[in-house]
From Swiss-Prot:
Residues 1-20 form the signal peptide. Residues 201-397 form the Peptidase M12B domain. The keyword Kinase does not apply. Pfam families: ADAM_CR, Disintegrin, Pep_M12B_propep, Reprolysin. It is found in: Secreted. Snake venom zinc metalloproteinase that catalyzes the conversion of prothrombin (F2) to alpha-thrombin through formation of a thrombin intermediate, thereby functioning as a procoagulant protein. Has a low Km for prothrombin and a high kcat. Cleaves the 320-Arg-Ile-321 bond in prothrombin and produces meizothrombin which is ultimately converted to alpha-thrombin by autolysis. Ca(2+) 2 binds at residues 407, 410, 412, 414, 417, 420. The active site is at residue 338. PANTHER family: ADAM A DISINTEGRIN AND METALLOPROTEASE DOMAIN (PTHR11905), DISINTEGRIN AND METALLOPROTEINASE DOMAIN-CONTAINING PROTEIN 28 (PTHR11905:SF32). Its cofactor is Zn(2+). This is Zinc metalloproteinase-disintegrin-like ecarin. Binds 1 zinc ion per subunit.
Length: 616
C-alpha cells in the first residue's frame, strides 16, 4: 500500500518524469511514465480465434521522450512444444506429471515501426513487461502498480541501481582452447553476421528448478513459471540471428529436496546433473538440452557453467544457472551465453568484434548485458555444425510439436492448415488459396520437398541424398508432400573403406578426431603412445571421478585405445609424437569418441573395446 501511495505522489508531482522507485527490476532512479494504447493488429487475412484470450498480433502506441512509438507484437508461437509437461513431487516423493495448456500464452516478440534495427521481447500477461530497442538504445517497460491505471514505467538499464558490483564470471575455462593468433589469422575469412544464412533449428529444453529455488520463491510455482517463461522468451530473441528457436518442453520442480547433490562447487554439481539427466530424465522426457536453475551461490563468483560442444550428448547437454538477478535480460544473457558454449562457441578474445563490445561470449559479466554475438561466435557455431553434426537440433520438430493455435494468413504452415502463403495480397504460391489456407482445386500440395508444381512427387523420388557412408537417402512416399524424417545406417555398419563403423549416423575414426583436435596434417600416434593410458595419470587414463582433482583410473590392457586419444602432430615446428588434448571445461575433449574402431571388429563403448556385433 505504501508503494502504491509513493507512485501516486510521484505521478502527481512528475506526471511524465518519474522519481526513484522500486520496480520489478529493482530500484530505478529515473524513468518516464507512459500510457500504452492498444490497437489490435492481426495479419492481413488472419482470423482471430474467439476462444483466445491473447491475440496472435497486437499493436501499442505511446511516446518516449516526446517521440511517438508504435510497438508491433507477434506471439512467440515457438516458445512451447505441444507435449509440454510439468513435473513435481508429492510429500511422499511420488512423481506427478501434468500437461497444462500453454497454447494461449502471453509472450511476444516485436519491433518498432519505422525502425529496421528494432527488436522487442514482451510479456503481455498483466500490462507490458519486457524490453525494446529503439534507435539503437534498449529501454525497459513495466506496469506501475496503480489500481485501474494504464501507467507504465519506461527506463534504461543505467537507471537501475546495482547493489552488487562484485565481478562475476562464466564457470567455463578455456586453458586449452585455440590461441588468439589463429583466430586473428582467419578473421579475413569470416562472413559478416548480417550475410549469414542458417537453417532453422530447434533446441527442445527442459528446465529443472532445484529446492533452493522453490524455497526462494516460497513454493510459489506460478511465480517461478512466469519468471522462466519471461527469461526464455528473451533467450529466443537473442538467438534469432542464428535462426535457432528454444522450445520449452518440460519444467520440473524439486519441491521436497534435490534429486542430486547441489553444492557451491559448480563443476561437481554440473557433472552430477549431467549424469542424472542421462540416467533418469532422458528415460522419461524427450528433449535436447536440460538446465538446472539454482539459488545456491556458486564458487569463484560463477553465474553459469556448461560443457563446451555438449549439445545432444546424453550427460553433457546440460547447464547450471544461478538465479542471481531479478532483471530478466540479465538472466537471459547468462542462459544464452552458456547455451552458446554447448553450441561450440568459446569465450571472445580481443580479435572478436560485434556492433558494440563486449559481445555475449565475453568471459565476465558485463553491465549492461551484451546484446549481440561476435564474429568469432558465428564462425565457431558454423564450424561446430560442420564438425559435430548435432543431430538432435538438425531435425526440426513436426509442425504439431510446436504449440500454437493456427492463424490463417501469418505465413506459418500450422497444424490444421493445408497451406499458408500469407495474405491474399502477398501470396505468391500458385497452389494455395490465401483466403482459406486450403489448396486450390486440383492441387495436391503447396509446400514440401516432395511437392512439384502442386503435385506430390512419385514414390521413390529422392528428396534428401545420403550425406556420407552412415547416412541413407530419403525418398518420397507418393502419399505426402514432406520428405520422410532423416534416417541413418544401422550402428556397426562398416564405413570409410572399413576404417570404422557407423555410430548414430557418424563414422568416428581416430584419424579424423586427431585432425579436428590439432591440424590437417595430424595423424594417429603409434601404438606405444596409447600404453600411457595404463598409468591412470593426469593425461593418461580411461575414466576419472567428477571434478578437477578427481582420481584417474587406468585402462585395462585391451581398452587402451578407448581412453585418451594420442596423435602425431606434423604441423610446422611441432612434430609431437604422442600429443593429446585436455580441457577443464569439457573433460570428454581428447577422449576417443564412442563408437570409434579400436580393433578389427571392435568399437569403443563406455571406454571399453568391445565386439561390434554385441555393442549395439
Amino acid at each position: 500500500m505504501i508503494q502504491i501511495l509513493l507512485v501516486i505522489i510521484c505521478l502527481a508531482v512528475f506526471p511524465y518524469q518519474g522519481c526513484s522507485i522500486i520496480l520489478g527490476s529493482g530500484n530505478v532512479n529515473d524513468y518516464e511514465v507512459v500510457y500504452p494504447q492498444k490497437v489490435t493488429a492481426l495479419p492481413k487475412g488472419a482470423v482471430q480465434q474467439p476462444e483466445q484470450k491473447y491475440e496472435d498480433a497486437m499493436q501499442y502506441e505511446f511516446e518516449v521522450k516526446g517521440e511517438p512509438v508504435v510497438l508491433h507484437l507477434e506471439k512467440n508461437k515457438e516458445l512451447f512444444s505441444e507435449d509440454y509437461s510439468e513435473t513435481h513431487y508429492s510429500s511422499d516423493d511420488r512423481e506427478i506429471t501434468t500437461n497444462p495448456s500453454v497454447e494461449d500464452h502471453c509472450y511476444y516478440h516485436g519491433r518498432i515501426q519505422n525502425d529496421a534495427e528494432s527488436t522487442a521481447s514482451i510479456s503481455a500477461c498483466n500490462g507490458l513487461k519486457g524490453h525494446f530497442k529503439l534507435r539503437g538504445e534498449t529501454y525497459f517497460i513495466e506496469p506501475l502498480k496503480i489500481p485501474d491505471s494504464e501507467a507504465h514505467a519506461v527506463y534504461k538499464y543505467e537507471n537501475i541501481e546495482n547493489e552488487d558490483e562484485a565481478p562475476k564470471m562464466c564457470g567455463v575455462t578455456q586453458d586449452n582452447w585455440e590461441s588468439d593468433e589463429p583466430i586473428k589469422k582467419t578473421l579475413g575469412l569470416i562472413v559478416p553476421p548480417h550475410e549469414r544464412k542458417f537453417e532453422k533449428k530447434f533446441i527442445e529444453l527442459v528446465v529443472v528448478v532445484d529446492h533452493s529455488m522453490v524455497t526462494k520463491y516460497n513454493n510459489d510455482s506460478t511465480a517461478i513459471r512466469t519468471w522462466i517463461y519471461e527469461m526464455l522468451n528473451t533467450v529466443n530473441e537473442i538467438y534469432l540471428p542464428f535462426n535457432i528457436r528454444v522450445a520449452l518442453v518440460g519444467l520440473e520442480f524439486w519441491c521436497n529436496g534435490d534429486l542430486i547433490n547441489v553444492t557451491s562447487t559448480a563443476d561437481d554439481t554440473l557433472h552430477s546433473f549431467g549424469e542424472w539427466r542421462a540416467s533418469d530424465l532422458l528415460n522419461r522426457k524427450r528433449h535436447d538440452h536440460a538446465q538446472l536453475l539454482t539459488n545456491v551461490t556458486l564458487d569463484h563468483s560463477t553465474l553459469g557453467i556448461t560443457f563446451v560442444y555438449g549439445m545432444c550428448k546424453s550427460d553433457r547437454s546440460v547447464e547450471l544457472i544461478l538465479d542471481y538477478s531479478n532483471i530478466t535480460f540479465n538472466m537471459a544473457y547468462i542462459i544464452a551465453h552458456e547455451m552458446g558454449h554447448s553450441l561450440g562457441m568459446l569465450h571472445d578474445t580481443k580479435f572478436c568484434t560485434c556492433g558494440a563490445k563486449p559481445c555475449i561470449m565475453f568471459g565476465k559479466e558485463s553491465i549492461p548485458p551484451p546484446k549481440e554475438f561476435s564474429s568469432c561466435s558465428y564462425d565457431q557455431y558454423n564450424k561446430y555444425l560442420l564438425k559435430y553434426n548435432p543431430k538432435c537440433i538438425l531435425d526440426p520438430p513436426l509442425r504439431k510439436d510446436i504449440a500454437s493455435p493456427a492463424v490463417c494468413g501469418n505465413e506459418i504452415w500450422e497444424e490444421g492448415e493445408e497451406c499458408d502463403c500469407g495474405s491474399p495480397a502477398d501470396c505468391r504460391n500458385p497452389c494455395c488459396d490465401a483466403a482459406t489456407c486450403k489448396l486450390k482445386p486440383g492441387a495436391e500440395c503447396g509446400n514440401g520437398e516432395c511437392c512439384d508444381k502442386c503435385k506430390i512427387r512419385k514414390a521413390g523420388t529422392e528428396c534428401r541424398p545420403a550425406r556420407d557412408d552412415c547416412d541413407v537417402a530419403e525418398h518420397c512416399t507418393g502419399q505426402s508432400a514432406e520428405c520422410p524424417r532423416n534416417e541413418f545406417q544401422r550402428n556397426g555398419q562398416p564405413c570409410l573403406n572399413n576404417s570404422g563403423y557407423c555410430y548414430n549416423g557418424d563414422c568416428p575414426i581416430m584419424l579424423n578426431q586427431c585432425i579436428a583436435l590439432f591440424s590437417p596434417s595430424a595423424t594417429v600416434a603409434q601404438d606405444s603412445c596409447f600404453q600411457r593410458n595404463l598409468q591412470g595419470s593426469y593425461y593418461g587414463y580411461c575414466t576419472k571421478e567428477i571434478g578437477y582433482y578427481g582420481k584417474r583410473f587406468p585402462c585395462a590392457p585391451q581398452d587402451v585405445k578407448c581412453g585418451r586419444l594420442y596423435c602425431l602432430d606434423n604441423s610446422f615446428k611441432k612434430n609431437m609424437r604422442c600429443k593429446n588434448d585436455y580441457s577443464y571445461a569439457d573433460e570428454n575433449k581428447g577422449i576417443v569418441e564412442p563408437g570409434t574402431k579400436c580393433e578389427d571388429g571392435k568399437v569403443c563403448i563406455n571406454r571399453k573395446c568391445v565386439d561390434v556385433n554385441t555393442a549395439y
